[in-house]
């Protein structure tokens, strides 16, 4: 089971190439700021825009740079069961702690199809799994009852829920009990999800405000509601601003403004609109946990 703050890592680019030096710097900076784990090759990492070779390289670099200091959960999910099995095997060979498997997108499988998909992966590869439910992107919702059934046949150590529904998260927490963790996939809902029984977050926000995000989550899990609410209030406007356009466009723009890496995203994603860039800059300047990093030279924040 997982507990704490796990960073949904961005993938820095230098032109058309992966910016490995910035990626390594980012890993070190996040670990120094006491996050509990790293999740490369997910939605925020622009995985659908990476070649197979690039996907493997990003996973390998993060695992190598983390060097066992924190768990590394590699995104291996695709909309092909066969390809997902292949990638999960590679993640295991690279030394990943676990694989994050998103529900298959575009295909719109039934609940039985989702069950069989995860069962096939678990049968083929001996690696703990984090199941990722994000209906807004996949077109399918993993039902809490299906999640409960998966625990009987697969080593699922956590469910990442980005349904946006506290009712569903509450049902999921009740369905899985103490057999697995439930992690928020929405930064703005992290505190409420912990309040109903969640155990942490897979966080976009933690790419740029790692220490504050991790401190908020620890406070909430430790029962320090006053501290958790204070940090939630300080971080909430920025968390919302990171979704003024499609993720990860805003968070990569924020990373550039904070001197962490280039804002470059790959097509079909486009750069942040100028008006939204100004809104994002205002949110960064207003947040006490990012304001001091603004205008640093590239790489200095790391």
UniProtKB/Swiss-Prot annotation:
Which biological pathway? Amino-acid biosynthesis; L-lysine biosynthesis via DAP pathway; (S)-tetrahydrodipicolinate from L-aspartate: step 3/4
Where can this protein be found?
Cytoplasm
Q: Which GO terms describe its molecular function?
A: 4-hydroxy-tetrahydrodipicolinate synthase activity
Q: What does this protein do?
A: Catalyzes the condensation of (S)-aspartate-beta-semialdehyde [(S)-ASA] and pyruvate to 4-hydroxy-tetrahydrodipicolinate (HTPA).
Q: Which GO terms describe its biological process?
A: diaminopimelate biosynthetic process; lysine biosynthetic process via diaminopimelate
Q: What is its EC number?
A: 4.3.3.7
Question: Which residues does the annotation list for site: Part of a proton relay during catalysis?
Answer: 43, 106
Q: Which UniProt keywords apply?
A: Amino-acid biosynthesis, Cytoplasm, Diaminopimelate biosynthesis, Lyase, Lysine biosynthesis, Schiff base
Catalytic-site annotation from UniProt: 132 (proton donor/acceptor), 160 (schiff-base intermediate with substrate)
Provide the catalytic activity annotation.
L-aspartate 4-semialdehyde + pyruvate = (2S,4S)-4-hydroxy-2,3,4,5-tetrahydrodipicolinate + H2O + H(+)
Q: State the family it belongs to.
A: Belongs to the DapA family.
A single GO cellular-component term on record: cytosol
Q: Top enzyme class of this protein?
A: lyase
Organism from which the protein derives: Thermomicrobium roseum (strain ATCC 27502 / DSM 5159 / P-2)
Q: What is its main location?
A: cytoplasm
The molecule here is called 4-hydroxy-tetrahydrodipicolinate synthase
Is Amino-acid biosynthesis among this UniProt entry's keywords? yes
According to the record's subunit comment, the protein's assembly and interactions are: Homotetramer; dimer of dimers.
